[in-house]
Curated annotation (Swiss-Prot):
Residues 22-125 form the CRESS-DNA virus Rep endonuclease domain. Residues 176-188 are annotated as: Oligomerization. Its EC number is 3.1.21.-. Implicated in enhancement of V-sense gene expression. Acts a an inhibitor of C-sense gene transcription. GO terms for biological process: DNA replication; symbiont-mediated perturbation of host cell cycle G1/S transition checkpoint. Belongs to the geminiviridae Rep protein family. This is Replication-associated protein A. Residues 1-22 are annotated as: Disordered. A divalent metal cation binds at E63, H71, H73. The active site is at Y111 (for dna cleavage activity). GO terms for molecular function: DNA binding; endodeoxyribonuclease activity, producing 5'-phosphomonoesters; metal ion binding; nucleotide binding; nucleotidyltransferase activity; structural molecule activity. The keyword Metal-binding applies. InterPro entries: CRESS_DNA_REP, Gemini_AL1_CLV, Gemini_AL1_REP, Gemini_AL1_REP_central.
Length: 217
């Protein structure tokens, strides 16, 4: 009787399995250590190798270490993704680079632009447009408080900005509106017209007598 196949053997990938690509990106940061090629020579070699991927931008910068040893740094931006498992894809004339996919091209560009040697580039650098950060709920509420000038305006802005909260917390918003925008007390209005307020003659005589009375100590 044949022994059952082990679970390890059954989990081995068959010939139909596709290997995961080693590099799969549109942007690469390469560093060629101990490389005595000029930036122009390296750029031409890379451009010819990447032609079918339609290079959008390539920049090569030379850096000399304190001992005079030259390094070359490269930023590559492609219009289509490069997908390869070939570890020697970027090898040029026997020089093998350190390869890193790029997430932030602006940082890499800034780094290789500060080198102390020659540089060469082709194409137009493409930078990701950063979307402005949305204000938080607290910031939006603070803007409403700062910009509204009365209760009605405040409540109207809250209703527009926070419709769900308005529906379930209306009483709290009305309370905060009353606390933020206190109304001055109403001006007193007499129920009697001024022409109806007449001092009786008898009272006039009494007042005159009291005010005009002279006393001696």
């Amino acid at each position: 009787m044949r022994a059952p196949a082990s679970s390890a053997a059954s989990n081995r990938p068959g010939p139909s399995n596709h290997p995961t690509p080693r590099w799969n990106s549109k942007q690469f940061f390469l560093t060629y250590p101990h490389c005595n090629l000029t930036p122009s020579e390296l750029m031409k070699e890379l451009f010819s190798r990447l032609t079918e991927k339609i290079p959008g931008y390539i920049k090569v910068s030379q850096e000399f270490h304190k001992d005079g040893d030259p390094h070359l740094h490269v930023l590559i931006q492609l219009n289509t993704k490069l997908c390869t498992r070939n570890p020697k894809f970027f090898d040029v004339q026997g020089f093998h680079p350190n390869i890193q996919p790029v997430r932030d091209a602006e940082k890499v560009f800034g780094y290789i632009s500060k080198t102390n040697g020659d540089s060469d580039e082709m194409g137009e650098l493409q930078l990701r447009i950063k979307k402005p950060e949305k204000p938080t709920r607290d910031q939006r509420m603070a803007m409403i408080i700062a910009s509204s000038t009365n209760r009605n305006e405040y409540l109207s802005m809250v209703r527009k900005e926070f419709p769900f909260d308005w529906a379930i917390r209306l009483q709290q918003f009305e309370y905060s509106a009353a606390a933020l925008f206190t109304e001055p007390p109403p001006v007193y209005q007499s129920p009697f017209p001024n022409e109806q307020i007449v001092c009786p003659p008898e009272l006039v005589d009494i007042i005159d007598q009291e005010w005009n009375q002279v006393t001696t100590d």
